[in-house]
């Protein structure tokens, strides 16, 4: 079982307390399910992406959280602010990066991995 959370499930961010609280809850659920289901050989992990290039992030309301001094921020202006949050020189990750992490955790290669939050975050949790 793979639950999708967010980097905000492992780190606090200003102005989105409701989102941070919900994503931290996913971590608690994942750990509880890992303990409950482990004896049945069911693995449970969570994935914690940074910004992903989807409409959830690529919209004016969200971009203004990251570029508050620009009334109508462009994708390029948002990219600069977003990249500054990451250790790796990328502004966001692609949906396929999350899909690949899910495939790995669901595969036999991860057969002994359970109860683990896996960041797919371009280093945002390190900065």
Q: What are these model-predicted stretches?
A:
Residues 75, 86-98:
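A conserved structural motif in NAD(P)-dependent oxidoreductases
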Residues 22, 30:
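Active-site helix of classical SDR
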Residues 43-53, 106, 119-121:
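Conserved SDR Rossmann-fold cofactor-binding beta-strand/turn motif
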Residues 38, 43, 113-115:
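Short, small/polar-rich loop/turn modules that mediate ligand/substrate recognition or access, typified
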Residues 49-59, 63-68:
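Short, flexible catalytic-loop segment of classical short-chain dehydrogenase/reductase
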Residues 6:
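Residue(s) in the substrate-gating loop at a strand-loop-helix junction
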Residues 11, 102-103, 114-127:
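Short C-terminal tail/terminal secondary-structure segment
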Residues 11-17, 39, 90, 108:
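Active-site loop immediately N-terminal to the catalytic Tyr-X3-Lys motif
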């Amino acid at each position: 079982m793979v639950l999708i959370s967010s980097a905000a499930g492992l780190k606090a961010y200003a102005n989105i307390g409701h989102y941070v609280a919900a994503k931290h809850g996913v971590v608690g659920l994942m750990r509880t399910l890992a303990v409950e289901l482990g004896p049945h050989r069911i693995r449970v992990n969570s994935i914690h992406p940074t910004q992903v290039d989807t409409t959830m992030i690529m919209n004016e309301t969200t971009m203004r959280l990251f570029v508050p001094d620009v009334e109508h921020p462009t994708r390029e202006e948002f990219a600069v602010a977003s990249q500054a949050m990451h250790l790796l020189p990328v502004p966001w990750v692609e949906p396929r990066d999350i899909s690949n992490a899910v495939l790995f955790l669901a595969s036999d290669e991860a057969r002994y991995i359970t109860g683990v939050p896996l960041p797919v975050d371009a280093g945002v949790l390190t900065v």
